[in-house]
Amino acid sequence: MHHHHPPYHLRRKSHNFLFTNLKMAAAAAASSAATVTASPTTASPACVSAATAGLPSAATSSTPVLSPTAAITAATAYCPSMLPTRKRPRRTYFTGDSSTGLGCSPAAHYLLYELPDEVLLTIFSYLYERDLCHVAQVCKRFYTIANDNELWKNLYQGLYEYDLPLFNPSPCKFDFVQPEECDYDNPWKESFKQLYHGVHVRENYHKHGGKETGRSVAYFETIQAAFDYCDDMERPLVLIHSGVYRTRLIIETNISLIGAAPGNVAENVILEEERESTVLFNEGAQQAYLGYVTIKFSPHSCNDTVQHHKHYALEIQENCAPTIEHCIIRSVSHLGAAVSVSGPGADPGIRHCEISDCENVGLIITDRAQGHYEDNEISRNALAGIWVKNYANPIMRRNHIHHGKDVGIFCFDGGQGYFEANDIHNNRIAGFEVKAQANPTVVRCEIHNGQTGGIYVHEHGMGQFIENKIHSNKYAGVWITSNSNPTIRRNEIYNGLQGGVYIFGDGRGLIEHNNIYGNALAGIQIRTNSDPIVRHNKIHDGQHGGIYVHEKGQGLIECNEVYANTLAGVWITTGSTPTLRRNRIHSGKQVGVYFYDNGHGLLEDNDIFNHLYSGVQIRTGSNPIIRRNKIWGGQNGGVLVYNGGLGLLEQNEIFDNAMAGVWIKTDSNPILRRNKIYDGREAGICIFNGVKGCWRRMKFSEMHKQVF
């Protein structure tokens, strides 16, 4: 592990001696004539009063902060040739009595003008922050050197240990920023100032139980001691340094706790508990903050987990709204969850956290709790990644939920929520499961590579699934069953290893404006008394049929475009009775609409064209109503009724087919009424032996004045 090693031992040994002498020389210089010393009005804005923070504010000075030794890593590496060219003032100076203010002593003049920058920088490196602020007021040269970036970087890393400047621009907001991306001339100094009011917790820090000599920094060995010290503070900040802290934290105030360590901060600062919830936020923690730590709940053994079904690594109760960021959260309990958010008024912000490798559910949100959950990694948990139940209503954005051993997100028992732009994949069951009156809104998520399916809505589940990408799932992209009634709108549902949308077991639902393509089975499958509304979808390029309605399936199917599928555009079979209106069904590699084995239903006002087989086929007891359709461009005829097919065909336009407009054969008995059959390359109607049927008021073109 990388650590920063500032010369604390040198500072403690030589601080008073160095600074006393430096102040004496500076005092002599400050009393010199105006021709020698800097103007007080130029240097004084560089410092903040010691009564406030003891630190300078670079933003209040218009003088640019230079870094004269940026290329020199230590004073021992000094070489005269490495120095920048610096114009020195004339060596003449007044020799009057310095006590009168009319002259400058040779020693003061040498200190101010002749002593090399590297030597001053080395001297300044032994000073603490408050003393640096003082010497920065002496003159412009001291101000420039005392604000050297490397000087403040070493000072900063010696106290806070971070590899990058950490900024606290507003309550509950802490961000690391690359120095070159900062707007500050000296980002290390600015970060130092923003964090300076913090209280430090460092294990085994025996020599610094209170304030450290020479600086206004408080150290404690336990988090509880730091809490006690901060009791009367407004918005206190506690910095927890590297170590394993086996303690329970109960937070009821607006305190900020943040890990402080080099490298990956959260991995080096660990909060762990074995008996009760490790971190508990209660009422009163409206603007509390916890960041950059690992939070673990580790019961002694598996036998103890029964008593821990309500214990968690992180627990947030009602009427509090803490912010938790950049934390690693683990639980090895086989019951409960790693994170629990429960109760009215529970409204946390959980961002950039990792909730992974837990032996239970990753995150439970329940009992009308809310909250914002953004940019988290939730993975490899033994049960669901997230549970939302009992009318909880969270907002979840840009989370990565993957490789769980159960479902990715499970909404049930009236759970709600808004889920946007989440990446949900490779979970053992569905990516998103909804049941029991749950009603989430899922927008612009990517739900893919599920080991069972993409979205599973069952047992009176609801929900709005809008503009998602649902693809590459092992089973159907969307499952709807058992009186569930979700809205599936403007999604891309593609490349499933089975079907696109599967509605069965009395499923309902509104399926509209989706792009469904490239699935191994039917783009939409409706069966067993299911009755959805399917409209304005594109269903194309499937390896099976476009829409498959069977086993007494129903549904209103309208205004869809179904094309370029490997098998029939629409299959209707086994007692099914859907209604198809105003669809465009075309360019299929087999039949356009295929009724067989007692398939029924209404086919009305559709365009059915350019199929390799017939536009419509009716067989084996099927008895549909086919009305006002345009059926044209078939490579094997317009309508084929055979093997005991029935049906009513009326007011259709059947034209430009390669073979007969209507074929009737093998014991079939359809009714044809007021159809227009024209421009075919064979007969208008072809009737074979054993055929019955009724047709009247038919209109044929000049080519079809005969019925064969």
Region roles according to the model:
Residues T294-Y391, I395, H400-H402:
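Right-handed parallel beta-helix
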Residues E203-I240:
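Acidic Gly/Asp/Thr-rich repetitive segments characteristic of extracellular carbohydrate-active
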Residues I223-D231, Y245-E252, V279-N282:
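Short, T/G/N/S-enriched strand-turn elements that build extracellular solenoid repeat scaffolds
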Residues M1-S125, H134, T144-E212:
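CRL adaptor-proximal regions
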Residues L257-I258, A288-L290, P322-H326, P348-R351, ...:
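All-beta strand scaffolds that present successive hydrophobic residues in beta-strands
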Residues K207, R215-F220, I255-H309:
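Right-handed parallel beta-helix/beta-spiral solenoid domain characteristic of secreted/periplasmic
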